[in-house]
């Protein structure tokens, strides 16, 4: 019999966890953050080996998993797209069975949700989803921890996601918010509304938590009562060929100071999972400006650098929340119930 409700479990999608479990992980994240700030060791994974599989590139996810693993006393091993043969020269099942005999836990960041599920099914060790095309669960813990840090609560708050309403971040914000009792508004063009299956899943959780779900094209309706404005890139990895179409579609959904003022809330915060294209100080930004005449994309530089911005706190919280997930599922902690 295990002493923890989390021990040995994988973290593949938020919908697999109860409200109490997600709240516990957010609370554990805050505790581990405090230990880190006070330089108190918390080596719950001493002697463990962690595989970091990256089919998609990353800055924050890789850095967060690496530093979190080291803080916990584990050894992280990075395996990039050129190091792994998932589904190419070797099946995901076979790869999972090999890695599960060498590593104590596996992180996967890539395209297919089915692939991360197969890793969990066949490896025999906890697997953590660092991002797939469908879900971004580790990001959600960081997002909602950041919201809780700013407001002291989650239930009853209103978060508005602006932009591509059918990407992984929008899916995860919608479902996780519904589980946690957060009102989630998706402000998006109809062409990019979330899939009906995702909306119905969120609505089911919202009935239990009392959260309100809204999907709309109307800016005034979307930001009414907003506590949090959130956006993400207009073009997700693997969709670069749709750039012109997305820029044209999503210009009206940019987070700018006019939208902030519509919310009429001095306590409002702005979140972004990063990277953000808010100026032309990158090769990418310059290229977009030259091709499409847009110098600021999903968020203006004014909002990005404003008093409302909390995205760098949010980015730091990736490390603390990922650490909590790894410790809870692999660290033999005493968590008999939540």
Curated annotation (Swiss-Prot):
Keywords: Arginine metabolism, Cytoplasm, Transferase. Disulfide bonds: none annotated. It is found in: Cytoplasm. It catalyses: carbamoyl phosphate + L-ornithine = L-citrulline + phosphate + H(+). Carbamoyl phosphate binds at residues 58-61, 85, 109, 136-139, 273-274, 318. Its EC number is 2.1.3.3. Pathway: Amino-acid degradation; L-arginine degradation via ADI pathway; carbamoyl phosphate from L-arginine: step 2/2. L-ornithine binds at residues 168, 232, 236-237. GO terms for cellular component: cytoplasm. It is an enzyme of class 2 (transferase). Pfam families: OTCace (PF00185), OTCace_N (PF02729). The keyword Cell wall biogenesis/degradation does not apply. Belongs to the aspartate/ornithine carbamoyltransferase superfamily. OTCase family. This is Ornithine carbamoyltransferase, catabolic. It comes from Streptococcus gordonii (strain Challis / ATCC 35105 / BCRC 15272 / CH1 / DL1 / V288). The gene is arcB.
């Amino acid at each position: 019999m295990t002493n923890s409700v989390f021990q040995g479990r994988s973290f593949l999608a938020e919908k697999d966890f109860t409200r109490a479990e997600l709240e516990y992980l957010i609370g554990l994240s805050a505790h581990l953050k405090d230990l880190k700030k006070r330089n108190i060791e918390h080596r719950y994974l001493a002697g463990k080996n962690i595989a970091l599989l990256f089919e998609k590139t990353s800055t924050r996810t890789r850095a967060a998993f690496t530093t979190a693993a080291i803080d916990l006393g584990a050894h992280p091993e990075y395996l990039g797209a050129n190091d792994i043969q998932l589904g190419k020269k070797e099946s995901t099942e076979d790869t999972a069975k090999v890695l599960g005999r060498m590593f104590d836990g596996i992180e996967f960041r890539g395209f297919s949700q089915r692939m991360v599920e197969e890793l969990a099914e066949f490896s025999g060790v906890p697997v953590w989803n660092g991002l797939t095309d469908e879900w971004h669960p580790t990001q959600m813990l960081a997002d909602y921890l950041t919201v809780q840090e700013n407001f002291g609560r989650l239930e009853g708050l209103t978060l508005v996601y602006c932009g591509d309403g059918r990407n992984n971040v929008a899916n995860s914000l919608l479902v996780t918010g519904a589980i946690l009792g957060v009102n989630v508004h998706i402000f998006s063009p109809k062409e990019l509304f979330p899939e009906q299956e995702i909306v119905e899943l969120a609505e089911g959780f919202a009935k239990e938590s009392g959260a309100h779900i809204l999907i709309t094209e109307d800016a005034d309706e979307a930001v009414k009562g907003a506590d949090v404005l959130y956006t993400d890139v207009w073009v997700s990895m693997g969709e670069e060929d749709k750039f012109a179409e997305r820029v044209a579609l999503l210009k009206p959904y940019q987070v700018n100071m006019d939208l902030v003022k519509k919310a009429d809330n001095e306590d409002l915060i702005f979140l972004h999972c990063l990277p953000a294209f808010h100026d032309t100080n990158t090769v990418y930004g310059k290229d977009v400006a030259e091709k499409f005449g847009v110098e600021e994309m999903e968020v203006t530089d004014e909002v990005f650098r404003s008093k409302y911005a909390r995205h760098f706190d949010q980015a730091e919280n990736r490390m603390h929340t990922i650490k909590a997930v790894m410790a809870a599922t692999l660290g033999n902690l005493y968590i008999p119930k939540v």
